[in-house]
Amino acid sequence: MIDLARIPGPIELEGEVCVIGAGAAGISLTRRLLRLGHNVVLLESGGLDYEPATAGLNAGETVGEDYYDLEDSRLRFFGGTTAIWGGRCAELDPIDLEKRDYVPHSGWPIGWEELERWYGEARPLFGLPARRPAPEDLRRAGVDLPQFDELETPLWTFDRRFNRFAWESCGDLEADPRCQIVTHATVTDRKSVV
């Protein structure tokens, strides 16, 4: 691991792919790229633990529903916000991707089918069942759920291993010679070299 907070000057790194952010998505993507044989540079804005100065980079205003300050609810260190995450996993529903007149800026550039095909690959990364649970699955298992004609029963799944993306759970990345992990590496600009 390279900690830019301990290096006085600029350094040069080479890799086929640069992944920005060592949270759940960045770590999962890095693992996949390594499995495919790529050389990866994984950049993390923070260090290995919470630092107020780095957290301050997230300062901003939240709008809409009352919620925690951004610098307290979006963490910049290895493992990202999963450090305060309860493991609750909710997949998007088809309507979440659709354009709705009553929701400003709604509508995704991809459809539900495009997103859904990736959920099957993502679920095992969090120790979740290979397919999305349905109310019928719970009823078959003996859970007494009410029957609704018009309402859908929302189900949540939980990752019971809360530290899945913490530094101590990522020894595979540190040990892989094709992976360069760089901390205190806040990205402020990018340039294509292709």
Segments (PLM) and residue ranges:
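Extreme N-terminal leader/targeting segments of oxidoreductases
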Residues: 1-17, 35-36
